[in-house]
Amino acid sequence: MWPTSAGLIAGAVLDRLIPDPRRGHPVAVFGSAAARLEQVLYRPSRARGALFTALAVGTAAGLGAGLGAAVERAAGPTGRAAAASATAAATAGATWAALGGAMLAREAEAIADALESGDLDEARRRLPGLCGRDPSVLDEKGIARATVESVAENTSDAVVGPLVWGALLGLPGLLGYRAANTLDAMVGHRSERYERFGAASARLDDVANWAPSRLTALLACAAAPLVGGSPRRALRVTARDGDRHPSPNSGRCEAAFAGALDLRLGGTNRYGDRVEHRPELGEGRHPEAADIRRAVALARAVDAGAAAVAAAVAVLPALPALPGGRR
């Protein structure tokens, strides 16, 4: 439908133009509410975790559905055009709230600034804003790799995913997806506390990100020439290395970025007391500070491509059918 299509494009533009507020951002408000719900429901149980996930994501999706219905009712007597415009405006606002591409770029570029100025302590201080690795054990190249990998993964999670689900399901899809992704960040990681309770959130996020992660990888491969890369090499690396990552989705994104940027990602990661040894992705050199900016440029190209794809998908139901039932 064109109101959804227009709203997705407008929301993506707003994400670039309007900085996220320091306090009161809708995603942060949801996270606080989910944390309180966790305190009430927590038990080291898969069933309790599934209930927690269903309530939190269901509430967010329900709010999206309720907002859409309220907008249509409010514009009812004024005609179809007013209702469509109101739906587009509501979708734009929800898209802006759900997207995190501009914030991701700003955080990554701030780390690049710190590394390029020789301020390793500042780069370490900022890294936890992007990922959960222990920055105290990372040198400049380790921080550069962690940042590039986070840009690749979060481009799918924070931009492409919301746009895809917004195109498919409108406001409920936008808000429900962002809720699922937020819960995964909160309780979906491996730890003694969340091994069972977080299983449902982690699995839901895997399912919800299956299509967005693969679209992210394809768009990154297509945009490789914009950062001096080769689409053919990016596709080859993605096909060869995308399944080597522990995550069924993040591996696709990181492998595509590695191939497009001609870098080598992966290796040993430390998360507090836990150490993971991951296979290497790509066949180029190890990332440096300047490669963070290249990764951000690639992510911005992917963001734009995803917005265009989402807008096209959203408008498909409104296209006239061709003879034989085809559009």
What are these regions (language model features)?
Residues 1-327:
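Short amphipathic, positively biased membrane-proximal segments
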